[in-house]
Amino acid sequence: MALDSAKKAEIVAKFAKKPGDTGSTEVQVALLTARIAELTEHLKIYKKDFSSRLGLLKLVGQRKRLLSYLKRKDYNSYSKLITELNLRDK
């Protein structure tokens, strides 16, 4: 369940700190959130797709680690990001 290039470019443009920024923590979290949303919709239809479920859990764990890092390093950016992505603060 990969994102198409147009949607990916839109997300990168929205969350990038500067033009061409594809590796910042904010961009990575936003891309992971979009992939998680797509996989969640897929799993609502195909409930027995366990390999996709494991992939989803891996993505959720990766996003959790990145959010934890961002919360430690730049709390203002973290709080702005979770409000934009409608994520819960732990």
Curated annotation (Swiss-Prot):
Q: Which UniProt keywords apply?
A: Ribonucleoprotein, Ribosomal protein, RNA-binding, rRNA-binding
Q: What does this protein do?
A: One of the primary rRNA binding proteins, it binds directly to 16S rRNA where it helps nucleate assembly of the platform of the 30S subunit by binding and bridging several RNA helices of the 16S rRNA.
| CDD domains found in the cross-reference section | Ribosomal_S15p_S13e (cd00353)
Q: Which Pfam families match?
A: Ribosomal_S15
Name the protein family: Belongs to the universal ribosomal protein uS15 family.
**InterPro entries (UniProt xref):** Ribosomal_uS15 (IPR000589), Ribosomal_uS15_bac-type (IPR005290), uS15_NS1_RNA-bd_sf (IPR009068)
> What PROSITE patterns does its record include?
RIBOSOMAL_S15 (PS00362)
A Gene Ontology molecular function term of the record? rRNA binding
**Gene Ontology cellular component list:** cytosolic small ribosomal subunit
Superkingdom of this protein's organism: Bacteria
Q: What is this protein called?
A: Small ribosomal subunit protein uS15
- The protein's assembly and partners: Part of the 30S ribosomal subunit. Forms a bridge to the 50S subunit in the 70S ribosome, contacting the 23S rRNA.
Enumerate the Gene Ontology biological process terms: translation
Query: What organism does the UniProt record list as the source?
Result: Campylobacter jejuni subsp. jejuni serotype O:2 (strain ATCC 700819 / NCTC 11168)
